[in-house]
Swiss-Prot record:
Broad class of the protein's primary localization: endoplasmic reticulum
The protein, known as: Retinol dehydrogenase 11
PTM comment, free text: Not glycosylated.
Organism: Homo sapiens (Human)
Enzyme kind, highest EC tier: oxidoreductase
Pfam families, sorted: adh_short
Length: 318
């Protein structure tokens, strides 16, 4: 009898998962930005805004009346997204600018152009990222994950920081991941030259996002600029394009994965919700403060990572 039941259960499993999917998805996609704040006259930059979570984040901010810059590597795709957002929201102040986070020259060029163009910056959302890339280096010789996900946004934030201070109250949102729990900052192997694993490299870079957020919050205390890191949830994303295994897993569990719109909610919560200033430096998931790993709470590592990052990017260490 048992021998007959097991094959039957295997046959029924896909059907049972399908039937349970709505409730499971509801459970996994909890957390909705409930803020009603409107943004007329506000200026926002969203990196990686031509797809996925970044696109949905930019769309909602445009819907609320902000002047939104889509900072993305693929300008042609960005222009198509900008037109889509303009049509959907009726907000024509959706602009596309070239930003390649794997090239510090591109980052500096973006910042220079933005600072010449705008008098204010109220929200910076560091959303762009890479995931599970085969070993490769940025234009400046950094390992791709740490180079794009951490160092690229570290430099961009520094270049725009004075504008954020001048525009205070203002906010910085860094998109991290639950994967940071598997991350470690190996200062002796920051560029992955001694040993490399694509999955772990992603985790390390997401840990770096949280450490950067916490150290930045300490340094910005009293400036009127607040900063938050977020875990968007497990989201349908182009980031898995480098891994056939992850693409297969995403397809297998597609019933349970958040949509990009759902994944954008925590970024929006941290960008918009009033009274969040006292929680600067915290990590959020599903629009609530979330627990982080022991290493992510290590102030000594955060300070050292700050100094090492400044040294790698040629920024003054203070």
């Amino acid at each position: 009898m048992v021998e007959l039941m097991f094959p039957l259960l295997l046959l029924l499993l896909p059907f049972l998962l399908y039937m349970a999917a709505p409730q499971i998805r509801k459970m996994l996609s909890s957390g909705v930005c409930t803020s009603t704040v409107q943004l007329p006259g506000k200026v926002v930059v969203v990196t990686g805004a031509n797809t996925g979570i970044g696109k949905e984040t930019a769309k909602e901010l445009a819907q609320r009346g902000a002047r939104v810059y889509l900072a993305c590597r693929d300008v042609e795709k960005g222009e198509l997204v900008a037109k889509e957002i303009q049509t959907t929201t009726g907000n024509q102040q959706v602009l596309v600018r070239k930003l390649d986070l794997s090239d510090t020259k591109s980052i500096r060029a973006f910042a220079k152009g933005f600072l010449a163009e705008e008098k204010h910056l109220h929200v910076l959302i560091n959303n762009a990222g890479v995931m599970m890339c085969p070993y490769s280096k940025t234009a400046d010789g950094f390992e791709m994950h740490i180079g794009v996900n951490h160092l690229g946004h570290f430099l961009l934030t520094h270049l725009l920081l004075e504008k954020l201070k001048e525009s205070a109250p203002s906010r910085i949102v860094n998109v991290s991941s639950l994967a940071h729990h598997l991350g470690r900052i190996h200062f002796h192997n920051l560029q992955g030259e001694k040993f490399y694993n694509a999955g772990l490299a992603y985790c390390h870079s997401k840990l770096a996002n949280i450490l950067f957020t916490q150290e930045l919050a300490r340094r910005l205390k009293g400036s009127g600029v607040t900063t938050y890191s977020v875990h968007p949830g497990t989201v349908q994303s182009e980031l898995v394009r480098h891994s056939s295994f992850m693409r297969w897993m995403w397809w297998l569990f597609s019933f349970f994965i958040k949509t990009p719109q759902q994944g954008a909610q925590t970024s929006l919560h941290c960008a918009l919700t009033e009274g969040l200033e006292i929680l600067s430096g915290n990590h959020f998931s599903d629009c609530h403060v979330a627990w982080v790993s022991a290493q992510a709470r290590n102030e000594t590592i955060a300070r050292r990572l700050w100094d090492v990052s400044c040294d790698l990017l040629g920024l003054p260490i203070d």
